[in-house]
Structures are given as C-alpha cells and as structure tokens.
Amino acid sequence: MKKFGLIGHPIAHSLSPALFKAAYDGKYAYDLIEGEDFETSYRRFIEEYDAINVTAPFKEAAFAKADILSEECASTGATNLLVKTPEGIKAYNSDFLGVRMWLSEVTEDLKGVLPPWPQGSRANSKQPGGLLQRAAPTEWAGSLSDHQSLLKGVKILIVGLGGAGKAAAAAAESLGMDVIRMNRTVRDSQTHPLDDFRKCFRKANIIIYNIPAAIPELKDLTDSDFNEDKPKLILEANYKDPSLREMMKSFGSKAVYTGGEIWLLYQAMTGYEILTGEKPDLTKMSDVL
C-alpha cells in the first residue's frame, strides 16, 4: 500500500491529513512527519514513503534534493511536493498550480483559459465560492509560457517571498502579469522593502499576502489607496490566523478578499493527484474547510 506524508515545522495544526483522508475516503495512509531538522525528515521520506508534501521551512531545501524538476517547479526555485520515480526524486510545485487556478477563477480576462493545465476541462457547475467540482489532469499541454500575454499590464503585488511567495510570483509571471515583489529582507534591486507597501498597494490590481503576521504598514491603508471603479483582488496565504480578513471587510466593495483555505484547497487538489495518480474528491475536500 502506498504511503504519503507531510514534512515541515511546525505542522501539528495542518489540515493536510484531513484533506487527504477526505480526498480518497481514507484509502491511503498520510502522516505528519514532524521535526525541526530537514535532513532527518527527508531521510524518513526516503526510507518509508512513496511521496510527500513539503511545507515551511523546508521548501527550498527539498528543491535542492530533487533529481528531476517539473516545469513549474524549475521556475520557482522551491518545491512543496516530492515523488519517488524510477528515474529519481521528482519535485513539483502545487502552490504554483493553486495560484494559477485561483487567478483563473477571479480574473475576468482568464475566462475560457484553463490554467494550470490548458488541455483539461472545466466543470460547468460550481459550489458556493466558485470552487471547481472536479480535479483536472496534471499533465501539461504546451509550455507555461503559452499564456504569457494573457494578463499583460495587470499589476500584482507579492508580499513575502518565501516558498509560497516565490511560487505566486512565478505563476503570475507565467500569465504575463507585471509582478511587484516585496519582502522583509531585500536581496536585489527588483524587490521592494516593506516600507514601500502602501505605494505598491496603490499600483496593484491584485495582492497576494504571504507574511504570517500583520505588518505595521497595513494600518496606513485608507479608502484612497483603493480603486473607485474596480475592486482590488486579495489572496492571503495564512488560513489559520489571517491578518487581512477583517481589515478588508472595512473597505467594503473596494476589496475582494480570498482566504488561504482556498489556496490550500486548490494546491491540495492538484498536488494530491500528482502524489497518487488518482483524482481526489473535491466535494469532500471542500467540506473539510
């Protein structure tokens, strides 16, 4: 029987085991491989598991272990999914795939396009909140660059450039978006410091917030930082203790907020099919959330 799990720290709060159980009705084992040391956790994967999900703070270290990189993984420099294959350990990035799926749901210009798998088929009916009712194929048709002109000129602000932030930036770039990067630690001229948050927020049509706590600069936002004619689309990665959810409600129709549980669901739905080779039950997965 195949065996799967999650490595990272801390992960006791993770919804992944419940999501995985719902996805396949308890057919497969899925363990939390808790530990602060990456090498110890990775060794357990090699010795005991067929494939694993990877979460913070191990995404970059896991990327370095891979023998084979999927296209989306190569574009991010991080992985959240390692699979044993006859050719070696293959790395994927379903954070990337989940963001592309979210963008396809919330961005009007993407209607009729099927990222992250252009050859798949979209379910006609949706659950409340726009959740797709079924998983799509995980095989790529063509290159990630096939849709690079689709959202040219759309500005997206990525706040926080850890593993999830890198994936979000790469996914946005693959659709031709103008990506504004921001991080606590600024390592290059293409990355803005947090002090620039309000200025960059004003410019952006879409904001993906990946920092696990509220930054002081959030308090400076006012109605004047939003567009009059079109709401800003906001995705927050942290679903356990969100910083923006209540704040964005105060701006009414000027902001459309999406919680991290949707990103979690979309990356899980794409990732679990890669792990197992079987389509997950999205309806049961969404019930967990």
Regions found by a protein language model. Name each.
Residues 2-107, 246-247, 256:
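Phosphate/diphosphate ligand-binding glycine-rich loop within oxidoreductases
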Residues 8, 90-96, 103-107, 152-173:
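Glycine-rich adenosine-cofactor-binding loop
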Residues 57, 208-213, 238-239:
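Short glycine-/small-residue-rich Rossmann-like dinucleotide-binding loops
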Residues 81, 226-264:
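ADP-ribose/adenylate-binding Rossmann-like module
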Residues 101, 105, 256-288:
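Active-site capping/gating segments
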Residues 108-152:
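Intrinsic disorder/low-complexity segments
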Residues 174-193:
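NAD(P)-binding Rossmann-fold cofactor-contacting core
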Residues 197-220:
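Rossmann-like NAD(P)-binding element
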